[in-house]
């Protein structure tokens, strides 16, 4: 493996009536996604895949990054395709599955840095560097809470093989 990393920003600009969604204003969500995407484009050198599951295309303002091969948009209509009682986590898993199947950048990488697309991970370069030099053989890097027995999926680093299960 060549230790190639790609940042995968997961997005649902129009959540519709998804349960447990506190921010439903599509315009605000769109601005937050655009701001975060701009942050990663300016603060990192990694290729970025923006995977959006409500069929909303925001690629127009980022054309120069697409044209130079730094950014890939994968947009599909997936938010209506599952039982909403399964929740946002299930929808996010479907986004990653779709990216595995349809993204050229993901196909070419060794590791995915999955970040919830509205968030700006200020230490993203340090996190990737830590993984690259300290944990390159680790299947997954994520914030884990042993007391609660859950993993925070807002950010994780993993090889593609882990996600294929």
Give residue ranges: language-model regions.
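ER/Golgi luminal nucleotide-sugar-dependent glycosyltransferases, focusing on the catalytic module
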Residues: 1-165
